Each structure stands twice: as C-alpha cells, then as structure tokens.
Regions:
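Mature exported/compartmentalized surface modules and terminal targeting/interaction regions
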Residues: 2-3, 7-260
Length: 260
C-alpha cells in the first residue's frame, strides 16, 4: 500500500475497512517501544477503582465466560477472574497496514483505562534492528489501554499477545498450559535463542518467523483464539521483538470498544 492510499485510509476519506483516525487535541504523544506479555491475570482496568464506574474492562472465567462482578479477585491472586481471550490482537479485512490490540500502558488510575493510542513503527528495534523490524516501517498498531503498566516505562506499550510471556505473575497454567516460553518475552524469545544471532539477516528473519509460527500452532493447538493472537506476532508484527514506535493518542475505534 503506498503512502497516499494509506493516508486516505487513515483519515477516513474512503472506507476499505480502516477506521477513521481522530487525534485527541492535547492528547498524549511521544516515542518508545512495544513489548509483549499475556499473564492471564484480571486486567487492571477491570477494577472500578482503577477504571472508574462504567469504564471497566471486561473479565472472564477460566472457561472464558464473562464475569460481571467488578470486585471478583484476580486469578493471579487466587480468584476466578482472568483476561478474556477476546482481547487478543487482530486485524481487520481491507486494512492491511493497521493492527489492533490491547495493552498495558504507562500511568495509573482512571486517566489511562479505556484510552487509545496509534503506534507508528519506525523500522528499528530497541535492542537490535533486523529485517523483522525494518518490515514494520509502514505498519501501525492501534492499542486500547485495558491494563495499567505500573512497571512500564514512559513510551513503552506492553501489548497483550498470547504466548508473549507471562511476566511476574502467571495465571496461565490451567488455561493455556505451561509451555509458554520465556517468562519475559515468551515464545518469540525462545525462538530468538534457538535460531541464534550468527546467521545472516534474511535467514534470521525466515527462521524466526517459521519457529514462532510452529510454536503458536503447537502450543495453542485446540485453542483457536490464543493461536490467532500468537500468530499476530508472527505475521502482522513480523516476529519483531521490541520494535520502536512513535505514538499519539486518538479516539478509540469501535472495533476495540466492542472488545474492551
């Protein structure tokens, strides 16, 4: 997709599946990087005290049924409430260069929950820049805050991706199994180590993507939603770890509000 067509898509002059992008005057903006995780805990924004009344993120049971009691304890604290797999990342038909996801974003309290940000990838990575990162240069990701990143640095968006790493808390064992890769970084981090760093860039790109796809299909066999979310990292995000981005706050598109 050339820049002219993408610009038309972004600003809503044609439909073609892309949402109309409406920037928030005086909204947050800056630069940073996108990390990844999926810990199966209750989202921070599912608590009324964090999100504000009527703005709570959805929560689910381990069987993925909705839980409507906003005071339900998190699975990571011995309770029944976990992240809904409907909050996996996804794409929209006819909008090839924009992805959609939920994330833990920097900040705290009702000022963060339910807000959306457009991330525009620079084509570089925080710790390395490989072909995987370069291929993200014209891609964008719209994220909606459903978690509060108390340990997330300024400009960092911790994107919710099944198999992206369970992090400090792990509520996933009886939902998604135990073979979820490195504690921080998940299946992709395992693939990066398995492929190694001593091969040429093209070979590294191909092998990392192939490795991650195989792991997504194997680990999440029989768990379609989790597998789709995992494959989003392999396909749309090109198996690129910690890509750099510029971000700007926008009005939330309906496709994310419907899943929040």
């Amino acid at each position: 997709m050339n820049k002219y067509i993408l610009a038309i898509c972004l600003f809503g002059l044609v439909t073609s599946g892309c949402p109309t992008i409406k920037y928030i005057n005086g909204g947050l903006s800056g630069s940073g990087f996108a990390s990844r995780y999926w810990d199966c805990c209750k989202p921070s924004c599912s608590w009324t005290s964090n999100a504000g009344s009527g703005n709570e993120a959805r929560q689910c049971s381990t069987s993925m049924g909705r839980i409507y009691d906003t005071n339900a304890r998190s699975k990571c604290d011995g309770g029944p409430s976990t992240t809904c797999l409907s909050q996996k990342p996804f794409t929209v038909s006819g909008c090839d260069n924009i992805g959609f996801a939920f994330a833990a974003v920097p900040g705290a309290g009702p000022s963060v929950c339910g807000r959306c940000f457009l991330l525009e990838f620079t084509g570089q990575g925080k710790y390395e820049t490989k072909k995987n990162h370069a291929l993200l240069a014209n891609k964008k990701l719209i994220v909606m805050a459903s978690n509060i990143g108390y340990d997330v640095a300024g400009g960092q968006f911790d994107v919710m991706i099944p198999g992206g790493g369970v992090g400090y808390y792990n509520g996933c064992a009886d939902i998604l199994g135990n073979n979820l890769g490195a504690q921080y970084g998940g299946l992709l981090s395992d693939c990066e180590n398995e492929v190694g760093y001593g091969v040429d860039d093209n070979t590294m790109y191909t092998r990392r993507k192939e490795c991650l796809k195989n792991k997504c299909n194997s680990v999440f066999s029989g768990k379609a939603d989790a597998k789709d979310g995992c494959l989003f990292l392999a396909n749309f995000l090109e198996a690129a770890g910690n890509p750099l981005h510029k971000y700007r706050e926008i009005e939330c598109p309906q496709v994310l509000k419907d899943r929040y």
